Amino acid sequence: MANTTGEPEEVSGALSLPSASAYVKLVLLGLIMCVSLAGNAILSLLVLKERALHKAPYYFLLDLCLADGIRSAICFPFVLASVRHGSSWTFSALSCKIVAFMAVLFCFHAAFMLFCISVTRYMAIAHHRFYAKRMTLWTCAAVICMAWTLSVAMAFPPVFDVGTYKFIREEDQCIFEHRYFKANDTLGFMLMLAVLMAATHAVYGKLLLFEYRHRKMKPVQMVPAISQNWTFHGPGATGQAAANWIAGFGRGPMPPTLLGIRQNGHAASRRLLGMDEVKGEKQLGRMFYAITLLFLLLWSPYIVACYWRVFVKACAVPHRYLATAVWMSFAQAAVNPIVCFLLNKDLKKCLRTHAPCWGTGGAPAPREPYCVM
């Protein structure tokens, strides 16, 4: 169980191991903070500055980056301070509740946003016309506000001691105090997080099945043109008969209106999804699934430790495993920019545009004017 008193449970003469462990924790968390703040700031500036990135997926990505950056700037310094002072909380109890609220808020916000993103990725591939028509800036803002509202609803009840927020000495942070499920109310929060992660992967699984079933294009079926007097018309007509009649080479009555040329407004507004757009949507889907998978991998050890505390009363969680799991959950705030720049060609192109020294040959030289003789 979590010890919240801040007193060491046992005193040993070998003080070198705790000091070395604290040094490693400080170095790793400092590195995570630097990478998270720099990477999320660069990615956010690119999305805000580049008009080509003003699309629904990048608005969601911007929200994730801002949340991770704020988490690194607000929550992690308190963890550094607690590690530096020997795994103890030197601030007030109210500040502990505020920091714990922020940590849980950003965790649930990432889970809710990743679920919403998975749904939009499925809509972008399976129902592209509806997605292109309905996924506007205001729709994205509504989705983001909904994710934040649900996150606040999940993180706010423990402020009133419903699943208490306390400083956990073994984790060096203020967070949920997970105890045996008969003595605490944190089981519902952990189940909600697990359901969200499972539902997100279920949506991506459905998207994968949809792409597998539609992996082959249907052959084009040519519809023959209709003619009683050599004035070909109908769905298969090319317009050559009408062109011949207008040019003076036709005989007989004027050909009727060609359905292949004149279309009503509803049919004209409908368009097929081009191959470049398909590749772009699939690329975004792979990038967001990689972010979701890393979220699952980095948070799973800590979630297992939480369930261990809730369901296993006799045996405590090993200290090394718990410390590793906590720092893996911290690392999740720094991985999103790395994944995005590795898997998204548009982001890499924009980054090279604003930082030519990172490109292969810098900015292209202007061509000399010439004229064709």
From Swiss-Prot:
Tissue and organ expression note: Expressed in the ovary, specifically in granulosa cells of follicles that have passed the primary stage and in oocytes (at protein level). Expressed in preadipocytes.
Domain of life per record:
Eukaryota
**From its record, what is one biological process in GO terms?**
negative regulation of neuron migration
**What's the protein's topology in the membrane?**
Multi-pass membrane protein
Where's it found, cell-wise? Cell membrane
Q: Which organism is it from?
A: Mus musculus
What intrachain disulfides are recorded?
96-174
Key words, A-Z: Cell membrane, Disulfide bond, G-protein coupled receptor, Glycoprotein, Membrane, Receptor, Transducer, Transmembrane, Transmembrane helix
The residues exposed to the Extracellular compartment are 1-26, 81-97, 161-188, 309-322
| Gene responsible for this protein | Gpr173
Question: Main localization of the protein?
Answer: membrane
The protein depicted here goes by the name Probable G-protein coupled receptor 173
| Cytoplasmic topological segments | 48-59, 119-139, 210-287, 344-373
